[in-house]
């Protein structure tokens, strides 16, 4: 099987079994950004999750303004959670103030990650 097809199959399997990964992701986020709040939004909470979807993870924390620093935090979260280079999880780091703006502009609907963790 080609590397591309293997990656696509792995991503599809991760979407199908996303709950298995969420606890590792939550633990990683809480280790790196101790006072963070973690939510899910997008197709995962609207019930429209399909094989080609991503899983949007919203992290509210006291994060740096610079996008490069945020990208470094995301890379650290991914590595600490043991995620492969290609995965369906899309991380969004926001401050509380930025979240308030997002809610006004995008009418954002989100739910706490705990509702989606494997029991």
Q: Residue ranges of each PLM-predicted region?
A:
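Catalytic core of pol beta-like nucleotidyltransferases
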Residues: 1-37, 46-52, 61-119
């Amino acid at each position: 099987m080609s590397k591309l097809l293997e990656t696509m199959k792995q991503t599809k399997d991760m979407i199908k079994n996303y709950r298995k990964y969420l606890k590792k992701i939550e633990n990683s986020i809480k280790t790196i950004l101790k006072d963070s709040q973690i939510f899910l939004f997008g197709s995962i909470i609207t019930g429209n999750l399909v094989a080609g979807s991503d899983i949007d993870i919203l992290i509210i924390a006291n994060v740096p303004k610079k996008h490069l620093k945020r990208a470094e935090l995301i890379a650290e979260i991914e590595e600490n959670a043991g995620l492969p280079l290609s995965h369906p999880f899309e991380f969004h780091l926001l401050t509380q103030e930025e979240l308030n703006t997002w809610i006004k502009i995008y009418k954002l609907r989100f739910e706490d990650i705990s509702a989606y963790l494997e029991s």
